[in-house]
Amino acid sequence: MKARQVLVFLLSVGAALAALWLVFPADGIAAGGITLRFASRDGYLRDASAVKVDVDSVLTGVASRFEMEADTLEHYRRFFHDNPDRIYLPDDDDHYFDAVFQQMEKASEEGRTVRVLHYGDSQIEMDRISQDLREALQERFGGSGTGLFPALGNVPSGSISRSASGALEHYTMYGDSTTQRAGHNRYGPLAQVVQLSGEATVNLRPTTNKNAREGAKEFSRISVLYGRPSPDFSLKVTSDTLKAKVTTETSPSGVTLSVWQFSRPVRRASVRLNGSAEIYAIGADGPFGVTVDNIPLRGCSGTIFTRISKPLMEESLSLEDVRLIILQFGGNYMPVARSTKVIEQYQEQIARQISYFQEVAPEAKILFIGPSDMGKSVNGRIVTWPRLPEVVDSLKATALRSGAAYWDLYRMMGGENSMGQWVKHVPPYAGPDHIHFTPAGARKVGEAFSQ
């Protein structure tokens, strides 16, 4: 075939495709139970006319709206009533968090620690978002360390290096069919339990993760929360040649918190266990102040807590002096949120979880963080998941009606179709799955939340 003929052929094909592009419906053509799709002029114009979120402008706006008159009490009152990026308070109660902050201030003065539990799905794995809140609170109220974590687990921590060996078995309340479930409901505050059946050692040292905050790497207080010990159970924490002051407190039903307080921060520590016991959590903290516990529950929609032993959870949270509980869920529910009725059922489940925490931690306040924007391919375009705005609004209404505060992450990002712009940002603030934040994006979210 001559070059001229090839050129004519290519031009003819191009002309035919251009003509098809001009007339093809944007929503495709239904034929025999299937839909034929092709790039179209209407679809192109629709994309071109769509409002695109400027991520940098959104984040700058969040910061500037908070900074204006931030040194006045009147500003804070207006912020919680009028600022679109605010934390929404139940009954518009300006004093909702007063008791929390009072306890945080007293903690440093009295040489004790108070805890903030941050539960979430995989969006907060590797200490994402939690570490920014931790850093902000510890700068203001004092404290250091990374908080609570399981003795053994399949999700690494972003702020501490942990290695375990010996007779330990890990069970979780959440996860798919590949995760092990215990034959009871005594899972503790991390929604997981590690069964000790013999000798075991858990070694701890500061993480080498480049994204970890320096304050999280510094700890001088090692604690172990456990229950149902055998008569021959023994527990010891060692760190180089340093000696520690050891205290132990046991609840009426036998949940025990043992604490090793060293005279200065340690570079490494070993927790040595022997016998039989249920290990609910290990903590690595500073001697006083605030600690924020990152508790990622991969694949969870936040509806599992009511299945955990209420007496065990109540006594655990009391021993750990928990004053704020953050629940960050909703994203994992989107694949099944196909109707308003299903969403209403989810509302009821979330309301029960909030009520559960209000019962087991009456001294704590509860804050619910809704899902981020999430992108899904529809007709070749990445758009917000169908019904996500409805889920966001329903969760907000449920939290406030149940007496919990609410922070709207979806709106903070820029609302509908904003996730695509977070993905396209340089550097990327979200991954190619259009669901999870990158470390840089998670930091922006954490900073916005911590304002």
Positions of PLM-derived features:
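Hydrophobic membrane-insertion alpha-helices, especially the h-region
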Residues: 7-25
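Active-site segments of SGNH/GDSL-like serine hydrolases
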Residues: 36, 328-334, 356-392, 408
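Juxtamembrane proline-rich low-complexity "stalk" or linker regions positioned immediately after a signal peptide
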Residues: 27-75
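Short hydrophobic beta-strand that contains or immediately precedes a catalytic carboxylate
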Residues: 116-120
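Catalytic His-Asp segment of secreted/periplasmic serine-dependent ester chemistry enzymes
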Residues: 310, 372-451
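Alpha-helical scaffolding within the catalytic cores
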Residues: 92-105, 305-319, 348-356, 389-390, ...
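Conserved SGNH/GDSL esterase-like catalytic core that processes O-acyl groups on lipids
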Residues: 124-238, 247-348, 436
